[in-house]
């Protein structure tokens, strides 16, 4: 089975988010974690999502990794390229979303592409080209305080244009999207006739995403958040195997929960876990830097906690003021690296001790943990929350993982994940 759709995602949780949407829409989907090596076999699936860690990478590195991933997918038979970024368009005015999209356009021969990070189920909508997080414009939402990609402008055309060297970015508004796929295609043609090659597309609900999916049929390249994953599988109607696309093997056992995200959503989830009596140990990056806290010590605590509880959470999660204080002391890059390295080492110790269920919060943390565990392929299972599925390694002695973007999930996400674990 050769993939019909090949996706290049700029972080690990974003990749699982998209894979979740594709599986929900009926495509048998496999996640390929990390930059692929040329010559590696492309997994047999209807959709393959290559999960990179390029969201905050320098432009040349992000472009190179993304092109390598797409070439690998294309050589494996993928017919359409889907460049997946965050539903909050995480980047900076000098970020890499525009350059990666431009490079993929050239590689795929696309003369036009769309940008639609909307994910209405998670409160991310676009109106008149402005991105909203629930009722708040992006620049008024907690994303304005993101430690790596503070989002200070909700106008996606204005945010994207500098990344494209000042190229004009068009808009296909909700009034057009409401009219369906034919109207969207006509708007695309009108923009192309004016020499405009890039356009933001409004989306306020799943019907809009499905219409955009139909309008995107046959396009060499689309760029979007995960939401468009609901609309695209239908364009391959008649070519899909059908049946359940999200079945996983039974795994069982206790779960280790690791949280490196400092988003407002994850802070609330950690607080709720603690309030509900969940086993919790807060990791202090300063203590790790000073040698007063170690991965070995953290795992010792977790292993003891898991003797009496179905799940134990180690969290480096802190509110924005505390994050800034740590970054001022250690530097932003060192602080992030300490968290990722320490939680990854704890995960390695847990796996060696027989733990086969992991729940991880934070895109960078998820990437670090899966890399440390040597996991390169994941089958996609049932949804825990919008954008977050359970996944499992392929082969004997499977390990189950839930990889959560920091911003996703209800306050009870950790409890919900634990209760639904395979």
Region spans (language model):
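Conserved, well-structured core segments that form the ligand-binding/active-site neighborhood
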Residues: 134-301
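Short acidic, glycine/serine/threonine-rich loops at helix termini
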Residues: 18-20, 93-97, 124-132, 183, ...
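A structural-propensity feature for long, helix-poor, extended segments
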Residues: 46-54, 308-310, 392-422
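Glycine-rich, highly charged phosphate/nucleotide-binding loops
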Residues: 35-38, 58-72, 342
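C-terminal structural cap/anchor segments
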Residues: 302-305, 309-361
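Cap/lid and interdomain-hinge subdomains that line or gate substrate/regulatory clefts
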Residues: 2-4, 46, 59-62, 70-209, ...
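N-terminal basic/disordered segments at the start of proteins
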Residues: 1-43, 64-66, 118-121
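Conserved, well-ordered active-site substructure
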Residues: 355-356, 364-413
